């Protein structure tokens, strides 16, 4: 029987323009420095299809002509487009297949994975209705203290990045 390797997942959730992408960039930079092979998945929650990466290129033409899956590879980089009804479980399987060590997900607010919530305003926490929160990151200058036993960090605090990385590496924070 094959052993299933652990595959830590952490979600970063928050409202639009709350700073999710900037925070994720900081995590990715530090993970890269530490040799962690971190996958990153973003949910396009704004309606419609995401913008194409290959506008007007051959793979875009293949897609327009009816291909369900197109890809282009060069210098070890693969760009893949697949027209399917993707559920999160299937996307996670894809990242595992690609042999990443762990996965950082932006969005998919209702998914059951451990979440770091990015807040512009304290009131956003209740409005998000997120479950399985492991930490809160706030952006305002005013100091926010612990919330219901959860660790709370300012967005500029490097310890916030360390906390998320420890979760992704399967370490206790």
UniProtKB/Swiss-Prot annotation:
InterPro entries: MGD_biosynthesis_adapter, MobB_dom, P-loop_NTPase. GTP-binding protein that is not required for the biosynthesis of Mo-molybdopterin guanine dinucleotide (Mo-MGD) cofactor, and not necessary for the formation of active molybdoenzymes using this form of molybdenum cofactor. May act as an adapter protein to achieve the efficient biosynthesis and utilization of MGD. Displays a weak intrinsic GTPase activity. Signal peptide: none annotated. It comes from Bacillus subtilis (strain 168). GTP binds at residues 17-21, 51-56, 99-101. Transmembrane segments: none annotated. Belongs to the MobB family. GO terms for biological process: Mo-molybdopterin cofactor biosynthetic process. GO terms for molecular function: GTP binding. This is Probable molybdopterin-guanine dinucleotide biosynthesis adapter protein. Keywords: GTP-binding, Molybdenum cofactor biosynthesis, Nucleotide-binding. Disulfide bonds: none annotated.
């Amino acid at each position: 029987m094959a052993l299933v390797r652990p595959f830590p997942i952490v979600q970063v959730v928050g409202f639009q323009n709350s700073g999710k992408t900037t925070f994720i960039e900081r995590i990715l930079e530090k993970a890269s420095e530490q040799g962690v092979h971190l996958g990153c998945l973003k949910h396009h929650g704004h309606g419609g299809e995401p913008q194409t990466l290959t506008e007007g290129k051959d793979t875009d033409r293949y897609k327009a002509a009816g291909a369900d899956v197109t890809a282009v590879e060069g210098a070890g980089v693969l760009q893949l487009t697949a027209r399917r009804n993707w559920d999160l479980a299937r996307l996670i399987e894809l990242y595992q297949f690609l042999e990443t060590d762990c996965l950082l997900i932006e969005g998919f607010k209702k998914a059951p994975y451990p979440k770091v919530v990015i807040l512009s305003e304290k009131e956003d926490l209740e409005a998000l209705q997120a479950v399985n929160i492991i930490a809160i990151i706030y952006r305002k200058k005013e100091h926010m203290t612990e919330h219901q036993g959860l660790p709370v960090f300012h967005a500029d605090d490097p310890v916030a990045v360390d906390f998320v990385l420890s979760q992704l590496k399967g370490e206790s924070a």
